């Protein structure tokens, strides 16, 4: 009880000194008597929407429950076969993934109109899907997909094709039945390309784990690039997710294949992953602003981050997520995303021009200290309460692991060996390798003992909390867009 009182005082101190939990925590934590079916989690990612009517409608149902709880949700829709493809069970041709996105769009509008918060959705789509061009242009149609943010999953292969001005194949996976019935030659490069795909069970797969994809159309990669750029310029969509880079830098690289993000895009997540957020208001740490003696209080900043890290970890226990799979996912990995807001305003208070070399160094310092302080607390919490369950588990070394991380083989790991999750996380994550460049002893301790969580940092746009709780400081890492503006409120 005495420790509870101590940390209560510490949490209040951190909140007064710039720690701002995300909107769902502020809105729903402690409000169980008035709205028991709500969550403290801002956003989630759906389970994989597989290519069947049952799966599509099942995920609509899950999304409805998630939105009802106050969470936003992201999905990948390029798992669905393209428009005009034959559906053998129905004896008809499919209308394609965009038409099914319309169902999710209407569902989101209907559910959110019943509550006090507008629903938020992210739809992601692979750049190699046959309907990718339709996806890119979808918001040119008035009123369509207005409950969605849209992002393209951009692969390294596509970027290389753009650089080399090569043709780009728009293709979709084939089953063995389709290969046999349609006489597809798997060795014909004009008919088939082999690609990584998020769903593998039902499709033809080679020894390298790549999926056979039937080419529907080939277009110049630079033409597609121009369409993406013009749409982004005209409508600010679709977003641009370098998905291979995301998976390469994912701390849980050995057990997750990320294909979607939360609605604002700051946190790529696996199936049923949750986005537990909080931000630190940097303007609170500027001493004697607008003077020659203006400086940043680094010691207090580090301590606020440490206390806030413990607070966000506690929120995992009261997540209030509606689906069993969501609750299991967050409890197993305990990921959260702490970021900062007010960077632009803080630079102004310090007399630093936004975009100058000095501002870049300050931003690097802020992000580095946020990460280091967070992982230090992650180690301390693991010692006190235990590491995230996944980091206490053991995993079998696979050929895929050794292919992704050649350093494992150099260190003596072989296929079939048993390796603790904490070592895969701390020693072989590319992100944790960057942390180790600054704090090698800390990362080595994390490899030996494990961390309380698998992920710590995530910088959100913070549009609402910057205005309502940070005295209209600039949001996220951006400069101030305007010093006064109007904002609509759904209801009073």
Give names to the regions the model predicted.
Residues 1-492:
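Extended catalytic cores of very large enzyme megasubunits
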């Amino acid at each position: 009880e005495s420790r509870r009182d101590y940390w209560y005082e510490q949490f209040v101190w951190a909140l007064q000194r710039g720690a701002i939990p995300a909107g769902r925590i502020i809105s729903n934590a402690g409000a169980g008597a008035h709205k028991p079916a709500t969550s403290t989690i801002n956003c989630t990612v759906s389970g994989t929407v597989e290519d069947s009517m049952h799966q599509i409608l099942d995920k609509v149902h899950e999304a409805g429950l998630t939105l009802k709880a106050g969470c936003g949700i992201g999905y990948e829709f390029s798992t669905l076969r393209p428009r005009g493809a034959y559906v053998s069970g129905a004896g008809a041709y499919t209308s394609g993934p965009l038409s099914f996105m319309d169902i999710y769009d209407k569902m989101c509008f209907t559910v959110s109109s019943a509550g006090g918060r507008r629903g938020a959705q992210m739809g992601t789509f692979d750049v190699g899907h046959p309907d990718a061009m339709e996806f890119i242009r979808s918001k040119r149609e008035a009123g369509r997909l207005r409950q969605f943010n849209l992002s393209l999953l951009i692969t390294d292969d596509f970027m290389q094709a753009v650089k080399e001005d090569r043709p780009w194949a728009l293709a979709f996976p084939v089953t063995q039945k389709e290969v046999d019935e349609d006489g597809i030659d798997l060795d014909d490069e004009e008919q088939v390309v082999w690609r990584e795909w998020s769903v593998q069970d039902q499709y033809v797969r080679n020894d390298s784990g790549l999926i056979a994809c039937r080419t529907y159309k080939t277009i110049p990669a630079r033409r597609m690039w121009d369409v993406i750029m013009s749409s982004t310029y005209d409508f600010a969509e679709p977003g641009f997710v370098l998905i291979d880079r995301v998976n390469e830098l994912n701390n849980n690289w050995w057990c997750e294949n990320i294909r979607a993000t939360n609605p604002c895009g700051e946190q790529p997540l696996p199936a049923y992953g949750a986005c537990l957020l909080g931000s630190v208001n940097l303007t609170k740490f500027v001493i004697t602003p607008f003077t020659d003696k203006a400086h940043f209080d680094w010691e207090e900043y580090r301590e606020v981050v440490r206390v806030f890290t413990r607070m966000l970890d506690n929120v995992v226990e009261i997540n209030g997520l509606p689906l069993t799979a969501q609750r299991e996912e967050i409890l197993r990995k305990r990921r959260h995303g702490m970021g900062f807001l007010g960077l632009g305003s803080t630079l102004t208070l310090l007399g630093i021009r936004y975009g100058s070399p000095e501002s870049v160094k300050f931003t690097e310092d802020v992000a580095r200290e946020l990460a280091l302080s967070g992982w230090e607390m992650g180690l301390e919490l693991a010692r006190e309460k235990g590491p995230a369950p996944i980091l206490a588990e053991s995993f079998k070394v696979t050929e895929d692991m050794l292919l992704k991380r050649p350093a494992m083989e150099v260190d003596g790991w072989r296929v079939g060996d048993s390796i603790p999750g904490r070592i895969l996380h701390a020693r072989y994550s590319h992100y944790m390798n960057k942390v180790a460049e600054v704090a090698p002893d800390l990362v080595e301790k994390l490899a030996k003992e494990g961390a309380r969580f698998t992920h710590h940092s995530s910088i959100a746009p913070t549009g609402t909390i910057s205005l309502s709780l940070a005295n209209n400081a600039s949001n996220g890492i951006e400069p101030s867009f305007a010093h006064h503006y109007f904002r609509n409120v759904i209801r009073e």
